[in-house]
A protein has these predicted regions:
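Beta-strand/loop nucleic-acid-binding surfaces
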Residues: 47-57
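A short hydrophobic beta-strand segment most commonly corresponding to one strand
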Residues: 92-102
Length: 131
């Protein structure tokens, strides 16, 4: 099974755009690091920067909900893309996001259910529906 999960910080606000066919696409980068004890002192160790791509409702909800610097959990699959730059073939590996959300270890979050169109429902509507 090709599934990967990351916990890290978003390096910039997600960028939302739409394909010619109307599908929502959001891209963002997650910086992953951990703390390691070296010579008796704790140090931050950078594990890498991971490009993430979300589609459709996940893309729209991520763009509305996530901001630069937030700590998030990302679940998805590794995808290798090939493209050309000035006639030279290049490859990149990115995470095709299936799930993303805030890491609640050091933060809190308010969750609002999305409507069928992908936009957040108002809290008044949720209260009327018994949410």
């Amino acid at each position: 099974m090709n599934q990967v999960s990351l916990v890290g910080n978003i390096t910039d606000d997600p960028e939302l755009r739409y394909t010619q066919s109307g599908s929502a696409l959001a891209t963002f980068t997650v910086a992953v690091s951990h703390r390691s004890k070296h010579n008796g002192e704790w140090q931050d160790v950078n594990d890498g920067f991971f490009r993430c791509t979300a589609w459709r409702s996940v893309a729209e909800n991520a763009a509305k909900s996530l901001k630069k610097g937030q700590r998030v959990m990302v679940i998805g699959k590794l995808v290798q893309r090939t493209f050309e730059v000035e006639g030279q073939k290049r490859q990149t590996i990115e995470i095709q996001v299936t799930n993303v959300g805030p890491d609640l270890q050091f933060a809190t979050a308010e969750v609002a259910k999305s409507t069928a169109e992908g936009s957040a429902a108002s809290s008044a509507e949720e209260k009327q529906q018994g949410a």
